[in-house]
């Protein structure tokens, strides 16, 4: 059966999500999920009918939240589908390329590889910023440049002036895709205001993080209307199930937004608690984080990761040497994790 698969698929290594890696324990800080399990109501009516391709109430609610027009908003099965839609819509397999800057989110490369589109990489600088000269030197045949801010797994914000420089550099050449999956934890850093000035900008968003709806799989792409219309040509006819649209719309109601804002404040406080506590352990290097996670460099990252795993504290190993990413949980989970690490290095 393997030989019947496309060559790209035969050679593909699937993305190792936190759920694929698994683990057993009672402290799960490996997938940047929210610790809040909010309740929603749905009557499961109309399940005998297909959903709208783009549910109007949901689109209007998210557009209002994001500060854009409904015509600039597309909803999909998580931001991951948005990545795939952009590549399918704008890249010719075997001709065009995408570009991204590791260390960063792995699905940009995997989505391109699955579709048969070339992947170009320009590593981030030593302080996790864009290497603009390297990007410019590699723009031939590039249709999409993916930038994650706050970046996963490093946690930092990409400098706004560098994003503007990149948008100027790629005018009439490529689309800059800003992955803002974690922007709700620092909304002042969003690039949504640049949409009016740059038609080559697309922004990915999700309800998985700050809205505590990772299991719902609901994401958004924000862009100018012309770009959105291109994506509507390739999206599945019924991408958002009826219950998903109903729950997502509730999350974006006045009450839902107030709850999300409160929970973001709580998680940001827990992140600060973790950051201060870990920074007091002399052998650790704690990188400043703006999402719901922190990247920490240990003397022996693999050893710490395995020891935590064995005690039921599930963290996320990183491709960066000796670095482990720690999701921000509730205060009890943060205290347990900090206590374990302190004892490990005592």
Swiss-Prot record:
Signal peptide, first to last residue: none
Domain of life: Bacteria
UniProt KW keywords: Amino-acid biosynthesis, Aminotransferase, Histidine biosynthesis, Pyridoxal phosphate, Transferase
Any GO BP: L-histidine biosynthetic process
Pathway connected to this protein: Amino-acid biosynthesis; L-histidine biosynthesis; L-histidine from 5-phospho-alpha-D-ribose 1-diphosphate: step 7/9
Residues recorded with modification N6-(pyridoxal phosphate)lysine: 209
Molecular function as annotated in GO: histidinol-phosphate transaminase activity; pyridoxal phosphate binding
Stored Pfam families: Aminotran_1_2
Enzyme class per UniProt: transferase
Catalysed reactions listed for this entry: L-histidinol phosphate + 2-oxoglutarate = 3-(imidazol-4-yl)-2-oxopropyl phosphate + L-glutamate
Known EC number: 2.6.1.9
SUPFAM superfamilies to which the protein is assigned, alphabetical: PLP-dependent transferases
Entry-linked InterPro entries: Aminotrans_II_pyridoxalP_BS (IPR001917), Aminotransferase_I/II_large (IPR004839), HisP_aminotrans (IPR005861), PyrdxlP-dep_Trfase (IPR015424), PyrdxlP-dep_Trfase_major (IPR015421), PyrdxlP-dep_Trfase_small (IPR015422)
CDD domains: AAT_like (cd00609)
Cofactor(s) in the UniProt record: pyridoxal 5'-phosphate
Similarity-based family: Belongs to the class-II pyridoxal-phosphate-dependent aminotransferase family. Histidinol-phosphate aminotransferase subfamily.
Complex formation: Homodimer.
Protein name: Histidinol-phosphate aminotransferase
Species in which this protein is naturally found: Vibrio campbellii (strain ATCC BAA-1116)
Gene encoding the protein: hisC
């Amino acid at each position: 059966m393997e030989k019947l698969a496309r060559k790209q698929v035969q050679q593909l290594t699937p993305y190792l999500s936190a759920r694929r890696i698994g683990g057993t324990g009672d402290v799960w800080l490996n997938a940047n999920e929210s610790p809040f399990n909010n309740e929603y109501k749905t009557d499961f009516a109309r399940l005998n009918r297909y959903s709208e391709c783009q549910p109007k109430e949901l689109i209007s609610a998210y557009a209002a939240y994001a500060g854009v027009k409904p015509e600039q908003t597309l909803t999909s099965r998580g931001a991951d589908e948005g990545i795939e839609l952009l590549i399918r819509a704008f890249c010719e397999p075997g001709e065009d390329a995408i570009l991204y800057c590791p260390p960063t989110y792995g699905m940009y490369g995997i989505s391109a590889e699955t579709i048969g589109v070339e992947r170009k990489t320009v590593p981030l600088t030593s302080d996790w910023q864009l290497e603009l000269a390297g990007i410019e030197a590699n723009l031939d045949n590039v249709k999409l440049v993916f930038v994650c801010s706050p970046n996963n797994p490093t946690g930092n914000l990409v400098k706004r002036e560098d994003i503007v420089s990149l948008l100027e550099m790629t005018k009439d050449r490529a689309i800059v895709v800003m992955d803002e999956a974690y922007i709700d934890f620092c909304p002042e850093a969003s690039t949504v205001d640049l949409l009016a000035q740059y038609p080559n900008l697309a922004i990915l968003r999700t309800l998985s993080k700050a809205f505590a709806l990772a299991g719902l799989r609901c994401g958004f792409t924000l862009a100018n209307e012309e770009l959105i219309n291109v994506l509507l040509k390739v999206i599945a006819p019924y991408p958002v199930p009826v219950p998903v649209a109903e729950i997502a719309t509730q999350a974006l109601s006045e009450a839902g937004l107030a709850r999300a804002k409160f929970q973001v404040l709580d998680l940001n406080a827990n992140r600060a608690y973790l950051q201060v506590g870990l920074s007091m352990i002399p052998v650790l290097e704690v990188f400043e984080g703006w999402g719901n996670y922190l990247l920490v460099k240990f003397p022996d990252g693999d050893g710490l990761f395995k020891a935590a795993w064995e005690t039921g504290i599930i963290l996320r190993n990183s491709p960066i040497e000796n670095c482990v990413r720690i999701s921000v949980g509730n205060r009890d989970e943060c205290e347990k994790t900090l206590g374990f690490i302190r004892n490990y290095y005592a």
